[in-house]
Every structure is written in C-alpha cells, then in structure tokens.
Amino acid sequence: FIINPGICPRIAEAAGIGPGWGALEVGPGIGVLTEQLCKRADKVVSIEVDKRLPPILAETMAEYENFKLVLEDVLKVDLRTLLAEEFGDKPVAVCANLPYYITSPILMRLLEEKLPIRNITVMVQKEAAQRLCAAPGTREAGAISYAVAYYAKPKLLFTVQPGSFYPAPKVTSAVIQLDVHTTPPVTPPNGDEAGLFRLIRA
C-alpha cells in the first residue's frame, strides 16, 4: 500500500482529471489514490478483485457519493459495457497502481480493446516502465514497447522509492502515462493488425 501522501495527488493531477471527467481505477487497495480521484472527477469506478477490501473501502470512501466499487477481475469484466453504463459520453482516464506480475496483461487489454479512454496513468516497477516507454528502434525496445507505441504515446513521469510503500518492495517504482491514440500512427498492410502483432512478437 502507498503510504507517501505526496504520490497519489501527483498521479491524479498527471491524469488531467477534472470536472466532467470519469475515472476508472484498477485495484483501489484501501482507497488512497481513489480519494484523490474522487476529489477531481465527476465519477470514479474502481475495479477490485480482492474480496477482503470492500469493507475497508466502504469506510474510507463513505463521504464520496461519486465513488462506485465493482468487485470483478479487470481481465474478465466487460469493460466496454462498464464504461458505457457508468460514464456515458464523459471523457475517461484510467489510473492504477498495478501489481508488478500482471502489468502487461492489464495494459494490453485496456489498449487492444480500443476502449473510449483518453489516457492511462499507472505506477509499475521501474524496469517495466522503461520497457513500456522505450522508443521503437532503440536497444531497450522490445515487443511490448512496439505494441504500446501502436496504441498510445508513452512517457515516464516520475520514479517512486521503495520507502513510499508499506511493506516496502525491493524495487523502485515509476509512474507512466499512456496517451491513447485516436488513430494508430501506422496502418498495417491490408489492415491486418493481427499480422502486424505476430510480426512484432516474432
């Protein structure tokens, strides 16, 4: 859990959320980031898979009428329907402090489904952040770098030291932002996206 009080306001501010916006949060934990989102957005929907956390969130988020908890697995829930039902035509930003072991699957699901979201601001392990944000053609770039660059413009915002968490992890974290493209920067031959990604992963 994040215990540094300065981190979550920076994440929420970086997401550009304000009046008229919706925020989709993945993994609210005990609600530290959630509270900052609720102070800025018209509505915040948090997806949480851990069934132990709803009682805690019910207490920590009691004063926020614009908060809704969805007890689901973000990799399985129907995100398109959820976004349409909860946010309508509001601009939506995604914010999350992602578990390191599941960073890529969650990000790629959010991007590959071409959901109506403006940006994704997440905290991940620093090494993962560097891979996700590596420019295509550089030595650091890998398949995930090319995949992310197809769907969004990534940037590394700031790093977060282990002491900002309890318990403290053994690695440094980083906050990144993916500004989702309205149209991809390249067009696959014959519009074959699946073929393009097979080539990327080869």
Q: What kind of region is each of these model predictions?
A:
Residues 1-202:
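Catalytic cores of RNA-modifying enzymes
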